[in-house]
Amino acid sequence: IAIKMLDMGYNAVVLRYSLAPVTYPAQLFEAAYTMKYVRDNAAEWDVDPDKIIIAGFSAGGHVAGLLGTGWNSKRLDYLLENVLHCSHEYVKPDGMLLGYPVITSGIDAHRASFERSLGEKYDEFIDEVSIEKRVDKDTPPAFIWHTCEDKTVPLENSLLMVEALRKQEIPFDYHVYAKGTHGLGLGTRETATKNMGHYEPQVSSWTECFKQWMGVMYE
C-alpha cells in the first residue's frame, strides 16, 4: 500500500508499532512520535506539513484512529512536554485513511486486536480505546472503506465511526463494497495471496476514490 501511495505521487512513511508485551498507550505514543518525525523533516522530504494523513488498515486502522481522536488527549501530555517537546497540534494528523478498521471495543469488537494491544491492561483500558467514543469536534476528516462480507472485523466497526463523525459534523468519505473478505489491501494482484485470494478488482477502486477525496479536501 505504501508503494502504491508513492506511485500515486504521495510520500509514504511506515510505522511498525508495538504489540504485547508492549501495551497501550505505547501505540498512541509511537504514532505521535512518527507524526512529529515527519513534520520535523517535512522540508527535507518535500512533505506539505499541513497535508499529513495517518493511514491504517485493520488493527493498524485502530492505531491511526487512536491518534486521530487522541492527539489532543491528556494521555499525551507528559510525552509531548517532556520527551517530544512540542504541542498537541504538532502531532495532529490532517486526515485519516481507515481501511476495514478495528474501531469499537463493544459488542462488534475484534477481540484479538485489543488483546494484542492491551495485554494485561485489557480491563483497565478497554473502554478508553473504543475509537467511536473518542471522536470530538477536533477529530480530523476521514476516508473510510470496508466490505459487507468482512467477518473478521464486522462492518459495524466503520459504521459506528461514520456515525460518530456525522454527529460531530466532521467531513468524511465512506465506501462500502458488496464483496470481499477481510484484509484485502489494494484488492489487486499485488496484494493477493498465492491462490489469488484477496483479489477483488471492484474493491481496488478505493485508491482512486481516496485520490479524489484528497483533491477535494486538501488541494
Language-model features, listed with the residues they occupy:
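Primarily recognizes the serine-hydrolase "nucleophile elbow" in alpha/beta-hydrolase
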Residues: Y33-S113, Y122, I126-D127
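Conserved serine/cysteine hydrolase catalytic core
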Residues: I131-T139, E156
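Short beta-strand/loop motif that positions the catalytic acidic residue
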Residues: D138, F143-H146, D150
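Acidic beta-to-alpha connecting loop that harbors the catalytic carboxylate
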Residues: C148-K151, K179-T181
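C-terminal catalytic histidine-bearing segment of alpha/beta-hydrolase fold enzymes
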Residues: L159-E219
